[in-house]
Amino acid sequence: QRQQWLREAVSQALAGPGAAHAELQRCLRVLAGPCPGEAAPERGLGDTGGHEGALAELAELCESLDNATDFCSLGGLEVVLELLGHRWPPLRAGAARLLGSCAQNLPEAQARALALGALPALLGVLRGDPDPRVPPAALFAISCLVRAQPEGLQQLEALGGLEVLGGALQSPHPPLRARAAFLLHCLLKEHPRLKAPLVQQGLVPRAAALLRSEHDGAHEHGLGTLCR
């Protein structure tokens, strides 16, 4: 229901000519401003509603390649990367989802995000964010930066990202396990040469342990990694 409401709101906001550009600018102005009560440690998560809404709307808008290109030209990636380190989990998760939405299928956005250091930041979130909502969003963004993107894959390998992906297979959180298994399956399918380093880093016992766990969405892709 929330997704349907968001799509309807975006459609209404984009009814006129040039409306998408104006809406991108409006949302970025929201994100550039401080969250209400940001200095108060006791502040509840609900106070970030304006920023969360702006991130969600931007992610919806940036599913259009034209809007994603415009978003990058407005400096949106720089704003989003700062929010990856925000103290409140919904903003970190929303920033990661927006980054993935913008980079998906847009080489220019991928290259810009990689040049800005998005991948090490996302891997840091994937390694150690304490909130279970955030790592799956980070993994989505990582996938959008490394699949069919040679520079992104090169960075992933250099940063030890393959080991991080393998470790995510052992997460206690099913959504993260499923995303990690899917990405590893895709990478092995697209780049068979990755089999050797992944096996060396313990992929086989990790994938086997995944298959022995309670059945969930990760099993099919976990089996796929073993069959590669």
Segments and roles (model prediction):
Residues 36, 64-67, 108, 119, ...:
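Flexible helix-coil junctions and inter-repeat linker/turn elements that act as hinges
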Residues 28, 32, 55-66:
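Short amphipathic alpha-helical segments enriched in leucine
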Residues 14-19, 33, 50, 57, ...:
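Eukaryotic helix-linker segments that join adjacent hydrophobic helices
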Residues 1-41:
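Intrinsically disordered, low-complexity regulatory regions
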Residues 7, 21-28, 51, 119, ...:
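A general structural signal for well-ordered alpha-helical segments in protein cores
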Residues 14-19, 67-74, 109-116, 134, ...:
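Short, hydrophobic/charged alpha-helical patches characteristic of ARM/HEAT alpha-solenoid repeats
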Residues 27, 79-81, 121-125, 164-166, ...:
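Buried hydrophobic core positions in alpha-solenoid tandem helical repeats
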Residues 1-5, 39-59, 88-103, 115-116, ...:
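Alpha-helical solenoid repeats of the armadillo/HEAT superfamily
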